[in-house]
């Protein structure tokens, strides 16, 4: 038996990653700080609360010269990266937040705004309901097959849970071409 259900995600994540490279660490940190400030200004203008986003620590990677003859190692430059993870309470605003953050690409280079990814955090409650529906569907199909062959149904001898899948949603015209993680609605499917 098969059961399907269209479910709206209850959590959205938008990642903003910005980086720079410079021979002077202070200049690189200043550049990162400016990008962080611009991201936070947009989040404040959209009235997101501080508990709806998280600023990750700055990551600094020095790049060294590779001359084997020299006894001392020399730092050529620094790669500096930081990210902000946004998890809006109202996931309906995710597209609006994403579009507004995209404007930063006009001002800053080396900035990636990742499309919102949507998650169903309470998936277990849907699994149980789908298993019940799929089992009922299997029983109904078995009865129909037996009627065609003029047989009667006996007791249930065995049942195996098959696949549980999260499939892309084809009903949301705005996101129909997006990958499943980037769709707010998902199609859950259970087979028994």
Set out the residue ranges of the language-model regions.
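Short, charge-dense linear interaction motifs
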Residues: 1-192
């Amino acid at each position: 038996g098969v059961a399907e259900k269209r479910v709206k995600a209850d959590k959205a994540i938008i990642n903003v990653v910005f980086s720079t490279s410079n021979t002077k660490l202070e200049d690189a940190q200043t550049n990162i700080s400016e990008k962080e400030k611009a991201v936070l200004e947009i989040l404040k203008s959209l009235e997101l609360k501080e508990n709806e986003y998280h600023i990750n620590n700055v990551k600094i990677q020095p790049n060294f010269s590779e001359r084997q003859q020299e006894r001392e190692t020399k730092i050529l430059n620094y790669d500096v990266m930081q990210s902000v993870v946004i998890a809006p309470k109202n996931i309906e605003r995710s597209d609006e937040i994403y579009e507004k953050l995209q404007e930063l690409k006009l001002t800053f280079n080396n900035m990636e705004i990742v499309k919102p990814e949507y998650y169903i955090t309470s998936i277990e409650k849907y699994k149980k309901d789908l298993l019940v529906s799929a089992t009922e569907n299997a029983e109904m199909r078995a009865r129909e097959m037996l009627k065609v062959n003029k047989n009667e149904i006996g007791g249930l001898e065995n049942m195996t849970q098959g696949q549980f899948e999260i499939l892309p949603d084809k009903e949301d015209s705005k996101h129909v071409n997006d990958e499943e993680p980037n769709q707010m609605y998902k199609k859950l499917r259970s087979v028994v």
